[in-house]
């Protein structure tokens, strides 16, 4: 790895010479992202993000490059880091850096580098601060809030509970020693955040409930055209892509255990069953468990599944769904991976003491005391981005169109009082707009209501067509 490390240079990527390759793939991705490109075309002249200085923390992929260039086309200034140490596509990062956007990301970052890079998206070259955050997983939002609390009371960063927190707390202490008011100064300047994923949304709601959230947030994840498409259809294609690239394993006939049957779990289970795996599901929620059972999946506990499964996939957004005890029961050569945002769904920390043998990047054999070996993918982090390239461009177009619309909404309404501190979702008509834009690529033909039909069901002919509480 020959990352650029000159701090006078306002980017840090693996190899800037990869920019040409990245640019070619970005051009292809644009043809597969109709919703996002239509938003770019619609708003470019109006420049609705003029004056916005966006600190972005989201997987630095080819698709994200199209998002970044859309935000810039609409008037924003942008700085970017990846939200995962393994998810960056180095040619995408190089292309964005070569185009003049400060980006700090390369595949295989250390945790120290990760938190250093997350800090750098807030350090504008002119000495100013950002005024918006675009987040995935909530780390950028967490950093400012936790750092501001630590300015007043460093006991909040005194006792790390994980390896991740060890590096985060150390990074905050280092920054406070250099600039004691850095966090509160940046926090005060932020006018809003748009959050991409389930895990980050959970954090936002927790902060809001505790009265800790300091600026308005739009929950992009729960837009229907995000969660029911990215989370479900995206995972349906990218999960097995990651497993196959990493292991070349035959999935047919094997017992695949999917932990969690939300949208991500549903897509993951469909993908594995499509390749003729015997799919078992673990769930805590009786409604989701019933859905899984009605789809023909066997619903079991992880305690039971551990000794039977061949492939394990966590999809919960929760903590220690697969424990050391579970892994100790597993078969020799069982494959263990995660497609939730953070690496603590699997208790990776408990097996770090064992012998790890790297088979290839992000694929490790972990030898247990009894001699058996488990195949751990992406060290428990996102398997579809660590071992493959994530979701296809088309489905990310829906997600990133929502992100762009949410950034416009918060920025345009920053002084109107429409969004006091809290967590919001985009209105239904914007969700439907994204779907309409995406349909163009598929040559779909929508039926139009007649006046009589619209009156009969009590909606406008142009929509929205469903109540906010409708479950798609």
Curated annotation (Swiss-Prot):
**What are the names of the required cofactors?**
NAD(+)
Q: NCBIfam families from the entry? A: ahcY (TIGR00936), PRK05476.2-3 (NF004005)
Please give the start and end residues of each transmembrane region: none
Question: For this protein, what does the record note about how its cofactor is bound?
Answer: Binds 1 NAD(+) per subunit.
Q: Give the chief site where it resides.
A: cytoplasm
Q: Which CDD domains match?
A: SAHH
GO CC terms, sorted: cytosol
What are the recorded GO MF terms, alphabetically? Answer: adenosylhomocysteinase activity
Q: In which pathway does it act?
A: Amino-acid biosynthesis; L-homocysteine biosynthesis; L-homocysteine from S-adenosyl-L-homocysteine: step 1/1
Q: Name one GO biological process term.
A: S-adenosylmethionine cycle
Catalytic activity reads: S-adenosyl-L-homocysteine + H2O = L-homocysteine + adenosine
- Check the record and name the PROSITE patterns matching this protein: ADOHCYASE_1, ADOHCYASE_2
Q: Name the family the entry cites.
A: Belongs to the adenosylhomocysteinase family.
**Known EC number:** 3.13.2.1
The residues listed in the UniProt record as binding NAD(+), with positions renumbered to this chain, are: 197-199, 231, 260-265, 283, 318, 339-341, 384
Localisation: Cytoplasm
Q: Which Gene3D superfamilies match?
A: Adenosylhomocysteinase-like, NAD(P)-binding Rossmann-like Domain
Q: State its role.
A: May play a key role in the regulation of the intracellular concentration of adenosylhomocysteine.
Q: By which gene is this protein encoded? A: ahcY
Q: What protein is this chain from?
A: Adenosylhomocysteinase
What the entry lists under PANTHER family is as follows:
ADENOSYLHOMOCYSTEINASE
Keywords from UniProt, A to Z, are: Cytoplasm, Hydrolase, NAD, One-carbon metabolism
Where is substrate annotated to bind? Answer: 61, 136, 196, 226, 230
Q: Which HAMAP family match?
A: AdoHcyase
């Amino acid at each position: 790895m020959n990352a650029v490390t000159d701090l006078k240079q306002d980017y840090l990527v693996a190899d800037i010479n990869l920019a040409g390759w990245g640019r070619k793939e970005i051009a292809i991705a644009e043809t597969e992202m109709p919703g996002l490109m239509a938003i770019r075309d619609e708003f470019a002249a109006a420049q609705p993000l003029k004056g916005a200085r966006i600190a972005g923390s989201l997987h630095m992929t080819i698709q994200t490059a199209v998002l970044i260039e859309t935000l810039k086309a609409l008037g924003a200034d942008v700085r970017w880091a990846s939200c995962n140490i393994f998810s960056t596509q180095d040619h995408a990062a190089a292309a964005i850096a070569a185009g003049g956007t400060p980006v700090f990301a390369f595949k295989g970052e250390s945790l120290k580098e990760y938190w250093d890079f997350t800090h750098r998206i807030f350090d504008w070259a002119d000495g100013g601060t950002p005024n918006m955050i675009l987040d995935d997983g909530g780390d950028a939002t967490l950093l400012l809030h936790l750092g501001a609390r630590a300015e007043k009371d460093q006991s909040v960063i005194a006792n790390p509970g994980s390896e991740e927190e060890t590096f985060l707390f150390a990074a905050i202490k280092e920054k406070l020693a250099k600039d004691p008011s850095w966090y509160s100064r940046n926090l005060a300047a932020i006018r809003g955040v748009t959050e991409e994923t389930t895990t980050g949304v959970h954090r936002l709601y927790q902060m809001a409930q505790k009265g800790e959230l300091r600026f308005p947030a739009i929950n992009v994840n729960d837009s229907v055209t995000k969660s029911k498409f990215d989370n479900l259809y995206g995972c349906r294609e990218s999960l097995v892509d990651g497993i196959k690239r990493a292991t070349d394993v035959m999935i047919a006939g094997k017992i695949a255990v999917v932990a969690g049957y939300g949208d991500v779990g549903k897509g993951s289970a469909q993908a594995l069953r499509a390749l003729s795996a015997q799919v078992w599901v673990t769930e805590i929620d009786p409604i989701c468990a019933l859905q899984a059972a009605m789809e023909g999946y066997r619903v079991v506990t992880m305690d039971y599944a551990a000794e039977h499964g061949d492939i394990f996939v966590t999809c919960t957004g929760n903590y220690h769904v697969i424990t050391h005890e579970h892994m100790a029961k597993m078969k020799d050569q069982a494959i263990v991976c995660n497609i939730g945002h953070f690496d603590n769904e699997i208790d990776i920390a408990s097996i770090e003491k064992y012998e790890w043998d790297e088979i290839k990047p992000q694929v490790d054999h972990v030898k247990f005391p009894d001699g058996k070996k488990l195949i751990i993918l992406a060290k428990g982090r996102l398997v579809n981005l660590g071992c493959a390239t994530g979701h296809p461009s088309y489905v990310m177009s829906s997600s990133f169109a929502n992100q762009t619309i949410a950034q416009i909404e918060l920025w345009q309404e920053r002084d109107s009082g429409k969004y006091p501190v809290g967590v919001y979702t985009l209105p239904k008509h914007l969700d439907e707009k994204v779907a309409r834009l995406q349909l163009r690529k598929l040559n779909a033909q929508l039926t139009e209501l007649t006046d009589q039909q619209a009156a009969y069901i009590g909606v406008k002919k142009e929509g929205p067509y469903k109540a906010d509480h409708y479950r798609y």
